[in-house]
């Protein structure tokens, strides 16, 4: 048996996507002493008796000060803790679930995150985040693959909306749902091809 512990969304905004820039207490230093900043999807932990969609709506409002429209989707799939991908029955899941993924390490192998597709309503501004990254998924995958810094990402055409200064020399790394998107991009691209246009 598994437990649903969180919800996140791949959120479109002006023909690109919005990704969170993690808070400084989650930054790491690599072996070269460079700061590594996690890039993830907007979302968070389920609280009390919330549904995944209720969690997502709350987190979106807290993190980017706006709401989202959930995009209709009826072909959900799962990414297992062993990184296998399978179709799942939409009747057994939250309405409009895009996919869910499981942790790859104990004790999280039986914990899942529900992922939805969304479209931002209005203009996002980081509230409970330092900033957000605006980019297309292909470019994000290229920058992650090449171990780029935020500055190099900006030179490639990404945009940052921030409320505090963020060290642009910091390297980016995928976390949470973005880590799963990267796995899908590498090995199961057909599952996300509609996001790559």
Language-model segments: residues:
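Active-site segment of metal-dependent pyrophosphate-handling enzymes
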Residues: 65-122
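Nudix hydrolase/Nudix homology domain
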Residues: 35-37, 101, 107-197
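Short catalytic/ligand-binding loop motif for oxyanion handling, primarily in non-cytosolic enzymes
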Residues: 27-28, 78-83, 124-127, 143
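N-terminal strand-loop-strand
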Residues: 1-42, 53, 68-69
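N-terminal phosphate-binding loop and adjacent alpha-helix
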Residues: 48-55
